[in-house]
Design a protein with these regions (language model features):
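Accessory terminal helices/loops
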Residues: 223-225, 236-301
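Active-site metal-binding motif and surrounding structural segment of the metallo-beta-lactamase
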Residues: 56-61, 69-113
């Protein structure tokens, strides 16, 4: 009797765990338009970037391959929404959290697409980054292989089957030289990668960042007809997500230039330039101060 009760309790826990996982899954995957999906990040699982996919009549175009452990879950999520073959995965830029999962998509039958500049950055920078990785256990990259993009474009690449139209449009240099977005004009959706973020913090301290061109790229992005903006990091937003990041960057650059003209040090400007009032992007003080120091060094060159 005790054994039967224990078995019943175990089965109940198993069912509860299953439904908890299913509930979590439904919260992570959003269908933001018919056949257009977003898979939100899971930072606690080191899946720090959002991803997406578009289900065409005969195939699937995925957007951002994530890390390998993220790609594995994203591929499973895609299979829950469609059985159509995954023919392409688009890397918005070459960084690890958006592109290191490429090989899993290739093994599923997809070709990796990005800008020509992104292809060059991947070949030049991702090989040493991959080899120098210090991840452990499930986050050890040695379990997988590095796969560089195979198809490149310089102006734009368009996927259109009459039901969906996706335009891959170069936007760099900004966050990286090879930045590009996926734009769906019919649905007014933009997958922006790290060109635009909707959370506290920013990536201006990244060595690849081009501060002044990034502002110009955000100005260009603001001219798109966007109802839904899917950032590389942060919650899904709208067109109004662009202005705060643009304001943060332009105010930062202007403040640093003024400080340099006064002969101030990077540390002094980082401590005195208060950008916390710019919601939400300016609210991470530590990241903003790191960005100020990085931009200071670039503007002094």
């Amino acid at each position: 009797m005790k054994r039967a009760a224990s078995l019943l309790a175990f089965l109940v826990l198993l069912v509860v765990a299953f439904y908890r996982d299913a509930s979590s899954q439904s919260n992570l995957v959003r269908e933001i338009a018919p056949g257009v999906f977003v898979r939100l990040a899971e930072p606690d699982k080191k899946i720090i970037a959002n991803a997406g996919w578009v289900v065409f009549r005969d195939y699937v175009l995925a957007i951002d391959a994530n890390y390998p452990w993220g790609a594995r879950l994203i591929l499973a999520d895609i299979r829950r929404t469609t059985s159509k073959p995954i023919r392409f995965v688009f890397d918005t830029h070459y960084h690890a959290d958006h592109a290191f999962g490429n090989s899993l998509f290739v093994d599923s039958g997809a070709a990796v697409v990005c800008t020509e500049d992104c292809m060059e950055e991947s070949r030049r920078k991702n090989t040493p980054a991959w080899k120098g990785d210090k991840g452990e256990a499930e986050f050890d990259l040695k379990q997988w292989r590095l796969e560089h993009p195979q198809l490149g474009f310089t102006n734009r690449m368009v996927f259109d089957d009459g039901a969906h139209r996706v335009e891959l449009i170069p936007m760099g240099p900004a966050h990286t030289r090879g930045d590009a977005i996926a734009y769906l004009p019919k649905e007014r959706i933009a997958f922006t990668g790290d060109l635009c973020g909707t959370r506290a913090g920013n990536n201006m301290a990244d060595p690849d960042a081009d501060p002044e061109n990034w502002v110009r790229s955000l100005d260009r992005l603001s001219r798109f007809d966007i109802a839904t903006l899917v950032p590389g990091h942060g919650p899904i937003g709208g067109h109004n997500a662009i202005a705060p990041q643009r304001l943060l960057f332009s105010t930062m650059i202007d403040g640093i230039r003024a400080g340099i003209a006064r002969g101030e040090s990077a540390d002094h400007i980082a401590q005195s330039l208060d950008l916390t009032g710019i919601h939400p992007n300016g609210e991470d003080v530590a990241r903003t101060q790191a960005s100020i120091k990085a931009v200071y060094a670039k503007l002094r060159k």
